[in-house]
Structure formats: structure tokens, C-alpha cells
Amino acid sequence: MFQDNPLLAQLKQQLHSQTPRVEGVVKGTDKGFGFLEVDAQKSYFIPPPQMKKVMHGDRVRAAVQVDKEREIAEPEELLEPFLTRFVGRIQKKENDERLSIIPDHSLLKDAIGCRPARGLDRAFRQGDWVLAEMRRHPLKGDRSFFAEITAFITDGSDHFAPWWVTLTRHDLARSAPQWQAGTLLEEGLAREDLCALPFVTIDSASTEDMDDALHVRENADGSLCLTIAIADPTAYVSADSPLDAEARHRAFTTYLPGFNIPMLPRDLSDDLCSLREGQRRPVLACEVTLDADGSLRDDIRFFSGWIESKAKLVYDRVSDWLEGRGDWQPPSDDIAAQIRLLHRVANARTQWRQQHALVFRDRPDYRFVLDDHGDVTDIVAEPRRVANRIVEECMITANVCAALVLRERLGFGIYNVHTGFDPALVEQAVSLLNANDVAANAEALLTLDGFCTLRRHLDSLPSTFLDSRIRRFQTFAEISTEPGPHFGLGLEAYATWTSPIRKYGDMVNHRLLKALIAGAPATRPDPAMTLQLAERRRQNRMAERDVGDWLYARFLKDKVNAPTPFNAEIIDISRGGMRVRLLENGAVAFIPASFIHAVRDEMVCSQENGTLQVKGSVVYRQGDTVPVTLSEVRLDTRSLIARPFSA
């Protein structure tokens, strides 16, 4: 009798319209239920039956119901799926042709039904790594989740899976681009012949793509004339060529533990353009004079040229020689003189930047030592030594010169820009600083001078607590076609051109500088390019991190409950515990709050304050160094679990 009853339909519509609705992101758990996080303060419980309609990370609209005085979210509409294109592993039962896939994500454990895309003719096996795309979702009216396999990555037993899986996940190339070997382009540039000068390169022993060579001349007045010669790939790659389009798409050389995937063909990056010892190479060069205090004179000159590197020097050998250690000697008196002059350049520029700009704190680089099978045999901490600083100071000098010339003569280029504190958050930064006895005001902090003054003070403190806390109020560095300051470096402008073999933005700046040299028109870069460059930079960094996490898990699985603790720096404190970085090897581990103190109600983990309190007393602060032991290594999620060390 109630079928098609208009009054009942009206009542249902009224109840539906009166039910409150919220939008948020689904957070899954490993216990079947989940939460809908609306913002940082508010979340709603999602019971297991409702969780079957969604997956972790989905953005949904949900109805809020009250059950036994508890607010419950019932997802109704999918706003943005978490999974679209994803990597996973094939699940296949014996004597069953049906396939399913488990996404490679720590909070996605349920198998999803799947089938190969049309034309993908392969007999998939248990454990195979594949690329897939979601095709069905319960909140889209489908009965269940379903995916389509779009590509095979590698089999489950491949020891090099970390590399292939990660490159596929981040949509990065697996091999170098190809090209038909060409000749030098006719660019209408007169190249100065500098082959007689003792230029040197300083790199790691294994480096093949050497893109910078250095030469210093001392003038009669004691000033130093520095020439930075940079490899010239745009002498072979024209702006409208397919190879240039491929380089723009890749944007960067991808550096992963054990190997790299170049932005340009290896014939170019590792041979024709690489500034190899004893080989005549085309370069784009910058010449500038440094006064004794490290300041740059206004005689900056860019030009095209030919050089012949007279020595391939290695960081550690040069550092040892300058520090009076080891038995290595420069191959000639000319090379020894160049090393000494370059050391003077670095010292002068470092001193100038300490007073007028900013110098980063030295942190070691961590290098994975791999055998032929991709197994990690060791992880080596490589401190930033004097030879590294020589190259760093020369490259920063060169990039400052390019930034100034492009700004003054063109008004555009590819600039690295960092504007310091976010104006919307700067008052919070002031409050934090004042609460920690550091005088500050918002107006000053938003200026380059004010920012630099604060950074120098923070760097002088014995603890990194304030330094690490203050960073969350800062903006991220950006890539821009417009000149702008780089607060992080303490410089009024910064435009890189010193790595054109590895960075497409540097190739663009090369072409702009060449246009100035030739007196030719220069084309303003498309602003959309900067978004693509920034996204590619993010993908490359994530790929390096992901492979690193995988290798750390493999290497450290045998170190669980080892008797000797690791010293670790606390890098983050959250509601659930602390993240720490092992100083010996750079690995990041998580310490659950339950491992710190047994009574949860007696503990306050404050991300806001960067502190962890037990019974009202601060026990740990962000930036502290603490001894820890590894409690668990989870190979499936590539995560490390640690606990505070107790003797």
C-alpha cells in the first residue's frame, strides 16, 4: 500500500535533505574500520561495512548519522579517488585464471579484481609487479572495485625491482633517450679558444657526466679572476628538435642509488658534452673578478669558447691534499696552483656569504654501496669536505652572475625563487620565536635582510630545535620565469645554468645567455614550463627517496635488536610518536608512542610544539639526538620501527 506513495517519497526526501553532510578524506586502518577526516580537528568514524565502499585516501561526501550517541559517516559520493594509476603485485590462486592486484601502499591491503588491458598478451604469475588503472568504484554505482592492468613491470623475484617499480610509479623513464649522432649547430657564435689554460674538473671518482670546469687567474692587485666553463649541450640540441622535446619532458637526469637515467642521450651527457680530461669541448663560460673580501665586481662576462680539461680531480683526493693528508699529489705544478687558487676563491666566497647571504649547515651525503646484484653491502656517510665546498662556491657564484645578467638585460629567465616566510603564517612564527626568547617582528621577517639575520642567529644556536620548528611557517622554493629573491640562500636573485646536461631549465638559460652574447632576440620561457619542471623535480626526489627506503629496509633487516644503538636525530613529533633519522646511515625510522611510555594518558605528543611530554615534563624535543635500537623492519612497506635504547 506504500508503493509509489507520494507522501512517503516526500518524507524520504525531507529526511535526506535534513541529514547533515560533510566532505573529507578517508583514513583507513588495518582493523577494518576507518575515519573521515574533515580537517585537522574533526573526524568521523566509518564502520567496516561502510569502509567496503571506499578506500584509504578517497575524498568523499558522506552523510552523518548518530548511532548510540556516536557520529558515524556513511560515504555517499566520490569526489576524488585516491587510486587512479597505481603500482601493485599480482595475486593468483592455483588452478584459477582470475587475477587480482594488491596496491603497493602501506594502508591498502585488500586485493582488487583486475584483468589485463586489451593487447597486453602476457601470462601473469603470482607476485608479478604491474601498473594498473582503476576502472570501477562502489561509489560510482559499481558493485565492487575493479582495475585494469596496463603494463608489466617485472617479475616478483627480480632483485632490481626497487628501481623498476619506483621509476614506473613516478612515471619516469627507465632508459636513456636515443638520438642520431649529430654535429655542432651553426649558432653564429664566435668561440674563444681557452684550450691552453689549465682548467680542471672536480667530481666523484665515478662521475662520467662532468659539466663544469674551473680556472682561476690572480691579478696584479691581488684580486682573482674566476672562469667557470660549463658543458654546452645546446650546441648539439636545437630548441625545436624532438630531442629537445624529450629533454623538456624528462626535465632532469634521474639519480638513483647505483645508476642514473640521463636527461640527454649518454653519447652527449657522458661523452661529447662531458668535459673529459684531454678532450677539446665546446663550453658556455662566465668570467668574473673577486675582490679579497669575496665580493663580485661588475665585470661579469659570458662568452662561448673551447676548453680542454687538464685534470679530472676527485673530491676526496683534493680535500686530503689541501688538509695535508694522504699521499696523492696533483699531476703538475700548474694543477697544484689551480687547486690553491680555487681554495682561496672558496674561502673568500664563503666568508662573503656568511656576512651578506646565507650558508647551509654541512650535512653528510649518504651513499649506498651496491654489488652487481643490487644488494647493499654498505652505506657510507660522506661529509661535505673542502673540495666539495670549492665546487659549490664556484657554482653559486656562476648562478648569481647569470641571475644578475638575465635580470638586468632581459628581465626574465628560469629562476629559483624562495620568498621566505608565508605572510599568512608569519605572525605564528613571531609568536614561536618570542616564546623562545628570540626577538622578532613580522615586517622584518618578510624582508630578505630580516630573514637572513634570523637564520644566522638560529644557525649560531647549539640546538636545531627552533630551526626545525620555524621551517613549517616558510614557503616552498619555486621555479619562476620572473626574477625574484631566494631567501633560503640569502640572495636577491638566483638562476642556475651550471648543469645543462642534467637540468632542462639550465638548457633554457643557456639559450637565453647565448642570445645575449650574439645580440639576438630572446624568447621569454612559457610560464607553464615552470610547473612542469617543478613537478618533475618533485617526482625525481620522491623516486630517490622511495628507492632509498627500499634499500634501507633490505640493509637493516639484519640489524633488528642489535646490541649497539644508533644515534638518531628527532625530525618530527606527531600524535602517534616520533620520526628519527639514524645519523650513521641517514635512514628514517618511526618510534610509536607506546614504545616511549606505557600509559598513553600520561603522555602528550605535540606536533604544534615539537615536544613530547610525560607527566607534564618535556622528555624529547624536535632536533634532539637520542640513542635508538631497531625493533622491526617491514619489508612490505619499506618502513623501520625503532624504540628508545635502554642499556
Curated annotation (Swiss-Prot):
The biological processes this protein is annotated with in GO are: mRNA catabolic process
**Keyword Oxidoreductase belongs to the record:** no
**Residues annotated as domain RNB:** 191-517
The main enzyme category here is hydrolase
Q: Where in this chain does the record put each S1 motif domain?
A: 563-645
A GO CC term?
cytosol
Q: In the Enzyme Commission scheme, what number(s) does this protein have?
A: 3.1.13.1
Q: Which UniProt keywords apply?
A: Cytoplasm, Exonuclease, Hydrolase, Nuclease, RNA-binding
Q: Which GO terms describe its molecular function?
A: exoribonuclease II activity; RNA binding
Q: Which InterPro entries match?
A: CSD, NA-bd_OB-fold, RNase_B_OB_dom, RNase_II, RNase_II/R, RNase_II/R_CS, RNase_II/RNase_R, RNR_Ribonuclease
Record's catalysed reaction(s):
Exonucleolytic cleavage in the 3'- to 5'-direction to yield nucleoside 5'-phosphates
Do the record's keywords include Zinc-finger? Answer: no
Tell me, in one coarse class, where this protein mainly resides: cytoplasm
Q: Which Pfam families match?
A: OB_RNB, RNB, S1
Its subcellular locations are: Cytoplasm
Classification via PANTHER family:
EXORIBONUCLEASE 2 (PTHR23355:SF37), RIBONUCLEASE (PTHR23355)
Family as reported in the entry's similarity comment: Belongs to the RNR ribonuclease family. RNase II subfamily.
Q: What does this protein do?
A: Involved in mRNA degradation. Hydrolyzes single-stranded polyribonucleotides processively in the 3' to 5' direction.
Enumerate the HAMAP family for this protein. RNase_II
**Name of this protein:** Exoribonuclease 2
Q: Give the organism, scientific name.
A: Edwardsiella piscicida
What does the record give as the organism's lineage? Answer: Bacteria, Pseudomonadati, Pseudomonadota, Gammaproteobacteria, Enterobacterales
